[in-house]
Design a protein with these regions (language model features):
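Gly/Pro-rich hinge or "lid" segments in bacterial periplasmic/extracellular proteins
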Residues: 81-84, 172-245, 255
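Alpha-helical secondary-structure segments
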Residues: 118-125, 152-154, 204-205, 242-244, ...
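Surface-exposed binding/hinge segments that line
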Residues: 137-186, 205-212
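N-terminal lobe/hinge region of extracytoplasmic solute-binding protein
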Residues: 47-96, 104, 127, 201
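Ligand-site clamp/hinge motif
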Residues: 227-279, 407
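Aromatic- and charge-enriched surface segment that lines or borders ligand/interaction sites
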Residues: 91-135, 148, 154-159, 307-309, ...
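Structural transition elements
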Residues: 206, 333-374
């Protein structure tokens, strides 16, 4: 039973896979047979279903929605596949109590305009912290900054908060390093975000050449890019800009973008929708890679509905799901170590495996009805709000709920409308099915999960105490056990799995990465001369 529950609750921080495959096959990382000097060149047209409204790393922060920002900007520090802090724009020293951080710019790091990155640029970028979360957890915690004659900045923090270092050393470029004058021009006080190509200056492997709002972002290789050469994994691995240029096209019509992919209008696409068989027939190559997102059910415990009032009703909905069967239907479920909502064995706890509403013995309907009776459920409608990209998963789940006599209505929304809808407290929704970001510890799961929909005075207190403890310490782990038990008792948030992303490409394209998603650093054409701008 525990093995099945562990599968249900599995969330793997990252998995480094490598395999070779033929066109039309599934691959999870490819090692090419092309010499290094022959890889450079060619153009890629990449189609995504998110529309870019700006070029600001503090605004366009989603790893999957705004792929281009991670190509342009880099945070001062980053994380490897195991969540360890690693050099990026800067090298560093961090004290054991994490109250003192020393940063210095790595030798040879330059901006896209060719100017050398100075430590003053890094500090200005950190202080900028325009995005709401870094604004809350970085700038206010900086007590003092001293820069010595050797270009070493010593940052002293007022107190420990795990989120402070999370945002300074993050795979998302929330704090993208930019020239000091740009950081000051687009300060928080200015209320402006970067939309001008001339001001979109970062340190990443590619630089912006053209931006058409809500249409496309084009970029070219940053010839002066200085990669970290140490053999780290994940986003800390060496990044190479092999391609001459890239254009990110944004097309929210999935059918049109799939047809365009088969016609050769695009070279790379995320997901195939209903066109997977056609993609394979067309000779396109499928890549699969674990992401840092997962699938999650988040109940609305604030609204005056039966879902909000009753933990038993929430448990009834989880009990109704036949997880063993669901795993068989949904092949994106990942087997691995770890339990909800921890990301690796370090934070594993058997609290979740002991929860009586995770049913694996086939008595799902009976168990659900017992919880429904305890909740006093009389068939009231429960509104389910979902992101349009999750229709397949939610169709399977809603069948279980209906079989158990739970009255579900589904509201399907595009991503932007979805976020806006559930963020407005006046809207009544029973639960939402979404993609949460998976970070490096229980404390960092999500402010929305832990301090908003999921909030109670008791959990707020525990969460605050966890945030002030060094993650992974003995006292942290003891407090985490308390919070995990409250999460089970409340059943307000249930992680279902870590998500596999699927990417489809022209068969001549090669991705080389170690713990990286198929971003276009480290990607190249086997025959670059055959892949110019269309």
């Amino acid at each position: 039973m525990k093995k099945l529950l562990a599968l249900f609750l599995a969330l793997v921080l990252t998995l480094s896979l490598a395999a070779c495959g033929k066109p039309g096959s599934t691959q999870s990382g490819v090692s090419g047979d092309v010499a290094e000097e022959d890889r450079y060149g060619g153009h890629v047209d990449f189609v995504l279903d998110f529309k870019p409204g700006n070029l600001d790393p503090a605004k366009s922060t989603g790893l999957w929605a705004y792929t281009f920002t991670s190509m342009i900007y880099e945070a001062p520090l980053t994380r490897d596949a195991e969540g360890n802090i690693r050099p990026n724009v800067c090298d560093f020293e961090l004290s054991d109590d994490q109250l003192t951080l020393k940063l210095w710019v790595r030798d040879g790091v330059t901006f896209h305009d060719g100017s050398a990155v100075e430590i003053e640029d890094v500090i200005a970028s950190i202080r900028r912290s325009v995005h709401k979360s870094p604004r809350q957890f970085v700038a206010p915690y900086i007590k003092d900054v001293v820069i010595d004659d050797d270009g070493v900045a010593t940052i002293t923090f007022t107190e420990y908060n795990e989120k402070t270092m999370y945002y300074i050393a993050c795979v998302n470029p929330f704090i993208g390093v930019m020239p000091k004058e740009i950081a000051e021009k687009y300060s928080y006080e200015s209320k402006n975000f970067i939309i001008d190509v001339a001001d979109a200056i970062g340190t990443g492997p590619y630089k912006v050449t053209e931006f058409i709002t809500e249409v496309a972002v084009s970029m070219a290789r940053h010839e002066g890019y200085k990669a970290v050469e140490e053999g780290y994994t994940g986003f800390a691995a060496p990044k190479k800009a092999y391609l001459d240029s890239i254009t990110f096209y944004y097309n929210t019509d999935d059918s049109a973008s799939c047809i365009g992919m088969m016609n050769g209008d695009y070279d790379l696409k995320s997901g195939a929708g209903d066109y997977e068989a056609s993609f394979i027939t067309s000779g396109l190559t499928k890549y699969e890679k674990l992401s840092n997102t997962g699938d999650m059910i988040n109940f609305n415990t604030h609204e005056d509905t039966i879902i909000g009032r009753s933990a038993d009703m929430r448990k009834a909905m989880i009990a109704a799901i036949d997880w063993v069967e669901y795993f068989g239907i949904n092949n994106t479920v990942v087997d691995g170590k770890g339990v909800n909502p921890a990301l690796d064995g370090k934070y594993a706890t058997d609290v979740f495996a002991k929860a009586p509403y995770f049913v694996t013995d086939g008595t799902n309907v009976e168990t659900s009805k017992k919880y429904q009776e305890a909740a006093g459920y009389k068939g009231e409608e429960i509104k389910l709000v979902i992101n349009s990209g999750l229709v397949t998963e939610i169709t399977a789940l809603s069948g279980y709920w209906k079989a158990a006599g739970i009255n579900i209505s589904i509201q399907n929304m595009e991503s932007a409308a979805f976020t806006e809808y559930y963020g407005e407290k006046s809207n009544v929704w029973g639960l939402r099915y979404q993609w949460p970001s998976l970070n490096n510890s229980p404390t960092l799961l999500s402010g929305t999960i832990m301090t908003d929909t999921y909030s109670t005075p008791e959990k707020d207190k525990l969460y605050g105490e966890l945030s002030s403890m060094i993650a992974g310490s003995d006292e942290y782990m003891a407090k985490w056990q308390e919070l995990a038990q409250q999460m089970v008792d409340d059943c307000a948030v249930v992680f279902m799995k870590q998500t596999k992303l699927t990417w489809w490409s022209h068969p001549d394209m090669v991705f080389e990465y170690d713990g990286l998603t198929p971003y276009l650093f480290n990607a190249y054409w086997r025959n670059p001369s055959e892949h110019g701008v269309k």
